[in-house]
Amino acid sequence: MDLTPREKDKLLIFTAGLVAERRLARGVKLNYPETIAYISAALMEGARDGRTVADLMHFGTTLLSREQVMEGIPEMIPDIQVEATFPDGTKLVTVHQPIA
């Protein structure tokens, strides 16, 4: 399989997002990289499903709560930016204060 660097990055984010999803299902609190991967993967999948940028910006704030991440993680992540592929092209999605 011959993937571009961008495709490799997307695959890595998606895989890390799956690991984070499984840990959440077991009740394990997510660390910084897991939190970023979980939210990023969900945003990328939402884009592929045809959701709008505005919808994803709001959706990104509903994915995780403070109780689901390790102490101090919400303060470490003031925003997340993901370059996602939408049906009409690639766009940048920015989620401010992703963990309420």
Curated annotation (Swiss-Prot):
An example Gene Ontology cellular component term from the record?
cytoplasm
- Gene3D superfamilies per record: Urease, gamma-like subunit
Pfam families assigned? Urease_gamma
Signal sequence annotation:
none
Disulfide cysteine pairs (residue numbers)? none
| Localisation per UniProt entry | Cytoplasm
| Superkingdom assignment | Bacteria
Record flagged with keyword Protein transport = no
Molecular function (GO) terms for this protein are: nickel cation binding; urease activity
Keyword list (alphabetical) reads:
Cytoplasm, Hydrolase
**What PANTHER family does its record include?**
UREASE
What interactions and quaternary structure are annotated? Heterotrimer of UreA (gamma), UreB (beta) and UreC (alpha) subunits. Three heterotrimers associate to form the active enzyme.
Q: What name is this protein filed under?
A: Urease subunit gamma
Originating organism? Pseudomonas fluorescens (strain SBW25)
